[in-house]
Design a protein with these regions (language model features):
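Long, His/Glu/Asp-enriched segments that create or flank divalent metal/ion-associated functional microenvironments
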Residues: 1-169
Length: 169
């Protein structure tokens, strides 16, 4: 399975961009017949948070289909790695745009997490400088969905229905 990593990437990208991600989200929204103004106003954290949240289900589902325990564990690890990257880039974004980090400070921060190649670190820095708050939409939005789910689980107890939760959010 030389291309199994690329298959996983395709599968989880489709989870994020297609169904149950943005495609589902957009079609569902359109079927609610919202006021026209709602098409002009959007919340990036909600939109990307939902897509990242359901992407996590894509990884979980992919892992559950694998009969090889090592491959299943690797798939779960890849989701954790994606979360860590989103978190690191979100923290870096906050450091640059809120705390005023220059490139040297940002590179030092990335080195703590093992990103030592200065060319790669510089590219990450430049991308975040040029797209402020981009990663925050994905990661904080995702964390907000996890918080909503946890609160609903606590409120509902044993009657919690994940499908109903997804329908409401």
């Amino acid at each position: 399975r030389a291309n199994s990593h690329s298959n996983l990437e395709l599968f989880t990208t489709l989870s994020h961009e297609g169904f149950p991600g943005h495609l589902y989200q957009t079609v569902f929204f359109g079927r609610t017949q919202p006021a026209d103004i709602r098409y002009l106003i959007t919340s990036g954290g909600y939109v990307e948070g939902w897509a990242t949240y359901v992407e996590s289900y894509g990884y979980q589902y992919a892992a559950s289909l694998l009969t090889d325990k090592a491959a299943s564990d690797l798939t779960a690890l890849m989701w954790k790695n994606r979360c860590i990257n989103l978190c690191i880039y979100s923290l870096l974004d906050t450091g640059i745009h809120y705390q005023g980090w220059n490139q040297t400070a940002a590179l030092r921060f990335l080195q703590v997490f093992g990103i030592r190649d200065t060319k790669i670190a510089s590219e990450i820095y430049q991308y975040i400088v040029e797209t402020p708050c981009n990663y925050l939409k994905y990661y904080l939005g995702y964390l907000n969905f996890l918080d909503l789910k946890k609160k609903q689980q606590e409120k509902s107890g044993s009657s919690f229905d994940v499908r109903e939760f997804h329908r409401k959010v």
